[in-house]
Every structure is written in C-alpha cells, then in structure tokens.
Amino acid sequence: MKALEEELFSKFQLSAQQYNALRLLRSVYPASMQTLALGKLLISRSPDTTRMLDRLEQRQLIMRERRSENRRVVEIAVTTSGLDLLDEMASDVQAMHRRQLGHLNRTELRDLTALLKRIREPHEDASCVWLDE
C-alpha cells in the first residue's frame, strides 16, 4: 500500500505527509490554521514539520503568516495553487484508493473505518473533527 502512495505522490513531487497537510488546510479554507494545530492533525507526526512546510511554501502551495500580536504563532493557509494541485490529483488519489482497498465491499470499508477511528480515538485531542464523521 505504501508503494502505491509513494508512486502517486512522487508523480506530483509531494510526500504523503505534504499531501495530507494540503488536504487538512483545504478542509478549513478559506480560513487558516496554526502550525501547532496542523501538526496535531497530521497522521504521521514528524519532527520536521517546519521543513515540510518550507517546501510547500517554496512551491507556493501554502502561505504562512505570523500574527502581529504574537510573533511565535504562525498561521498557514493553502493557496489557490495548492487547491489546484489537489484538484489535479483527485482522480489519481481515488484510483490509488481503489487499488489499495477495492477488494473490500461497502460494509467492510465502513467496519475498517470504524475500527481505525476506535484505535486512534484514545490518542486524539477531543477537538479532532474526523472522530465525529
């Protein structure tokens, strides 16, 4: 499964972590999200979140802004270029998911999702919106 992800994301010069960050930022668009909040939501919590965001910013897929009242707080927002890239990737991402999980029926997929949520729930901040889906 990981090989399929790497194959897809490398086609767009992204890592799975970068894709996930863009996807999470799109979920709050047009608003922004603080770096710390994004870090808590990422599936794989990497210590080099700043470098990952640097790479996305260099490609103009995100923009960062420091709050004037507290310069330590950095707000991140996806740009229109980032949104365009996610749109461009959408059909390929769906095809990848079909290759990864297409052998499961609807009930099995629902059960898998429920189990994954249950596994992750004790480790999540109560504010995680995906737990309520």
Which functions belong to the PLM regions below?
Residues L4-R45, C128-L131:
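N-terminal helix-turn-helix DNA-binding core of bacterial DNA-binding proteins
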Residues T107-E133:
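C-terminal regulatory/oligomerization modules of transcriptional regulators
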Residues P30-S32, Q94, R120-H123:
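A short hydrophobic/aromatic micro-motif that marks alpha-helical segments and, especially, helix-coil
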Residues M1-L4, M89, I119, H123:
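Hydrophobic recognition helices of helix-based DNA-binding modules
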Residues D54-K117:
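Charged, amphipathic alpha-helical coiled-coil/dimerization segments
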Residues M1, L42, S46, A90-V93, ...:
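Flexible interhelical turns and helix-capping residues at alpha-helix boundaries
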